[in-house]
From Swiss-Prot:
Species, as recorded: Dickeya chrysanthemi
EC number from the UniProt entry: 3.4.24.40
Localization per Swiss-Prot or TrEMBL: Secreted
Residue sites binding Ca(2+) 6 per the record: G372, G374, D376, D394, D401
Positions with a binding annotation for Ca(2+) 7: G381, G383, D385, D411
SUPFAM superfamilies: beta-Roll, Metalloproteases ('zincins'), catalytic domain
Keyword set includes Cell division: no
Reaction(s) catalysed by this chain's protein: Preferential cleavage of bonds with hydrophobic residues in P1'
UniProt protein name: Serralysin C
Propeptide section residues: 1-17
Enzyme class: hydrolase
Entry's cofactor comment: Binds 7 Ca(2+) ions per subunit. Binds 1 zinc ion per subunit.
Ligand binding (Ca(2+) 2): G299, D301, T338, E340
Entry comment, domain topic: The Gly-rich repeats may be important in the extracellular secretion of this metalloprotease.
Length: 478
């Protein structure tokens, strides 16, 4: 049975006599932070995305009550105008300023995008599910410079759903210009909706550290509810912070309220030229640090990272991590989401497709493109690019890939992963012996047709169509 590398099946990757460097780079990205399945990372058990979502919602409470899962909720929120003290006894109340109000609404929106929750603002004496307020002094009346914020899970008590922020902290006062302030808002709202920290720790209880985590993926690379740096799991955000729910948070909130299947059902673009109307999905310059997990309910969608000059690694498989814009492991795709297309920048990029019909554009630089299964349209762009194939199912005769800007003498078609027995060879016609490559040139259509017969018959299982004439001697890695 043929194996498709895009399915991340180990069996597809064995027994290569001399895999190429391009193949190895694909292998490395497809296996980038594998998780769950009994793995141990950093001396801790590794959790799958689903198991992490369960852990983050382990109290099993939402605004629908205890042990109610996947049920939508229409919630209210309110910016408090006064309060004698917080439920913890902190005093010195300050109402939210304009920047806090604006950023809190964006944070609420980011949760509503991924789950079946709606938020309606109320004022005056009306009660609300989620409330916002600042404090400046601790319960002893001293100015508080030691805390950041805290919140309470859903419930029927007076404290339930309240969120509180230390106004003495710069990023709390200015979440519009300081990323950690925005992340704090999203984090505390997560608590107010029913999400826990991934582990049993709190900032006010002792001196917790990453060594106290329950599972390895308890970092900000996977959850905005975590306290711990993404560097613990191999990521590097270079001092930047996420603004919206991350990969495991999406699984967690959807466990409680269900998935929002009305979000971005059209053709959405993430990154440069974004039409998402979400700041954390949008880049307008190369200085913008993108940190996000994509949730998208439909359409023909694109990751556009064309404005970066860094070497990038872009993986369109759901649940995967990508290195974008000079950061590491900073972009992910939520489980069940299909992003069809990717655009690289001017660096030497690696682009990996999924099982959909992908369009991959490498842009400038020496890029490596792997479409996986599906009828893909591949553009290397300028530079010396490599198009990698690992199985006959990567480009079927009935639905072939197209290489649309192949530069003979510069670009390469890498078939080394198919040459497991060192028996691939070019022929003028198929003999039925297997391991045969046939390259036909259609001058009238300006198209080269690359056929492979890997079985012991005379019918090809594999076809790639290439615009332009390809050289048998110069353009292949076998």
């Amino acid at each position: 049975m043929e194996k498709n590398l895009s399915s991340r099946d180990d069996d597809a990757l064995h027994s290569l006599s001399a895999p190429s460097s391009s193949y190895n780079s694909i292998y490395d990205l497809l296996h980038y932070h594998e998780r769950g399945n009994g793995l141990t990372i950093n001396g801790k058990p590794s959790y799958s995305i689903e198991d992490a979502g369960d852990q983050i919602t382990r109290d099993n409470v939402s605004w629908n009550g205890a042990n109610v899962f996947g049920k939508s909720a229409n919630l209210t929120f309110k910016f408090l105008q006064s309060a004698r003290s917080t439920p913890d006894g902190d005093t010195g109340f300050v109402k939210f300023n304009a920047a806090q109000i604006s950023q809190a609404k964006l944070a609420l929106q980011s949760w509503a995008d991924v789950a079946n929750v709606t938020f309606t603002e109320v004022t005056g004496n009306q009660s609300a599910n989620v409330t916002f307020g600042n404090y400046t002094r601790d319960s002893s009346g001293r100015l508080d410079y030691g805390t950041q914020a805290y919140a309470y899970l859903p419930g029927s008590g007076s404290a339930s759903g309240t969120t509180w922020y230390n106004y003495n902290v710069d990023n709390i006062r200015s979440p519009d210009t300081m990323e950690y302030g925005r992340q704090t808002l999203t984090h505390e709202i997560g608590h107010a909706l029913g999400l826990n920290h991934p582990g049993d720790y709190n900032a006010g209880e002792g001196n917790p550290s990453y060594s106290d985590v329950t599972y390895a993926e308890d970092t900000r690379q996977f959850s905005i509810m975590s306290y711990w740096s993404e560097k613990n799991t191999g990521g590097d955000f270079k001092g930047h912070y996420a603004a919206g729910p991350m990969l495991d948070d999406i699984a967690a909130i959807q466990r409680l309220y269900g998935a929002n299947m009305t979000t971005r059902t059209g053709d959405s673009v993430y990154g440069f030229n974004s039409n998402t109307d979400r700041d954390f999905y949008t880049a307008t310059s190369s200085s913008k640090a993108l940190i996000f997990s994509a949730w998208d309910a439909g359409g023909n969608d694109t990751f556009d990272f064309s404005g970066y000059s860094n070497n990038q690694r872009i993986n369109l498989n759901d649940g995967s991590l990508s290195d974008v814009g000079g950061l590491k492991g900073n972009v992910s795709i939520a489980e069940g989401v299909t992003i069809e297309n990717a655009i690289g920048g001017s660096g030497n990029d690696l682009l990996i497709g999924n099982n959909a019909d992908n369009t991959l554009r490498g842009g400038a630089g020496d890029d490596v493109l792997f479409g996986g299964s599906g009828a893909d349209r591949l553009y290397g762009g300028s530079g010396r690019d490599t198009f990698v194939y690992t199985a006959a199912s990567d480009s079927k005769v009935a639905a072939p890939d197209w290489l649309l800007d192949f530069q003979t003498g510069a670009d390469k078609i890498d078939l080394s992963a198919l040459n497991t027995g060192n028996n691939l060879h070019f022929v003028n016609q198929f003999s039925g012996s297997g391991g045969e490559i046939m390259l036909n040139w259609d001058a009238s259509a300006n198209t080269s047709n690359l056929y492979l017969n890997l079985d012991n018959n005379t019918s090809p299982e594999f076809l790639v169509k290439i615009v332009g004439q390809v050289s048998q001697t110069a353009d292949f890695v076998v």
